[in-house]
Amino acid sequence: MAADKQAKLSLQEDSIAKMLICKAHIGTKNVEHKMRPYVFKSTSEGIHLINLAKTWEKILMAARVIVAIENPADVLVISARPYGSRAVLKFSQYVGAQAIAGRWTPGMLTNQITQKFMEPRLLIVTDPRTDAQAVRESAYANVPVIALCDTDSPLEHVDICIPCNNKGKESIALMYWLLAREVLYLRGELPSRSVPWDVMVDMFLWRDPEEFERKERLEDEEAAPHTAQADATQWGADAAAADWKQAGADWTGPAAGGAGGEWDQSAVAAEGEWGGGRPGVAVGEPW
């Protein structure tokens, strides 16, 4: 019986592969003394690697805490780091929690006069260092905190830390995806952990809006020469000749002069006093 429970809670190969691909195990060169138990080993370059088995254990523990809260809206997920903004929004969408992506307004948990005052029962932060203001206010309001912690993250006022790489956009997206999947499984909305979830990890991945604009601009620039070439091919040789012929059909040249090429006075007067206004040129003289 105990072996079956251990097998159900054990880390699956698919989840391990996802963590390795998203580089969730790569830490930093600095290690907080409270984060040392979660470090597996360090590379020759001095980068500490995180034990993914303990990461999975903390994800299971955090999911059980989230499920224990009756109202999902009492769970607040925040991320001041831009890479985690899309992940927290997607997590709140599938789990039903509240999300704040962006700058944290001071006093949201402590100042009751503000319009944005909130009273959550659980706080989930992407980085306890960048979200330090929210973690500090949660300690004043007696709100438990779940945090994605790197090897150099401070664990002060953090109740449950999920050791992972909280600086990469792929790792942050995967951590929230795994946490959301586990919450839905414990609620009974997913039949089993082995059954693939129809929501992909890419839905939680942060995308740069400037990159989309850059791609659209390049696509427009590539399509512009083809459009100009297509318009140019519509004008064939026959169409151009017909157009020139039609444009020159109504044109008539000026009245021809005499055989000797001389201009008479009447012709000059009809043309608007040609030669009369020029000094040194007599009317009727040849040019």
From Swiss-Prot:
Self-association state and partner proteins as the record states: Component of the small ribosomal subunit. Mature ribosomes consist of a small (40S) and a large (60S) subunit. The 40S subunit contains about 33 different proteins and 1 molecule of RNA (18S). The 60S subunit contains about 49 different proteins and 3 molecules of RNA (25S, 5.8S and 5S). Interacts with ribosomal protein S21.
SUPFAM superfamilies documented for this protein: Ribosomal protein S2
Primary subcellular site in the record, as a coarse category: cytoplasm
Pfam families: Ribosomal_S2 (PF00318)
One GO CC term, this protein: cytosolic small ribosomal subunit
Residue ranges of the region described as Disordered: 216-243
GO biological process: one example: translation
Entries under PROSITE patterns matching the protein: RIBOSOMAL_S2_1, RIBOSOMAL_S2_2
Family, similarity comment: Belongs to the universal ribosomal protein uS2 family.
Function in brief: Required for the assembly and/or stability of the 40S ribosomal subunit. Required for the processing of the 20S rRNA-precursor to mature 18S rRNA in a late step of the maturation of 40S ribosomal subunits.
Compartments in which it is found: Cytoplasm
Originating species: Toxoplasma gondii
S-S bonds: none
GO molecular function: structural constituent of ribosome
Name of the protein this chain belongs to: Small ribosomal subunit protein uS2
Keywords tagged on the record: Cytoplasm, Ribonucleoprotein, Ribosomal protein
Low complexity biased stretches: 227-243
InterPro entries for the chain: Ribosomal_uS2, Ribosomal_uS2_CS, Ribosomal_uS2_euk, Ribosomal_uS2_euk/arc, Ribosomal_uS2_flav_dom_sf
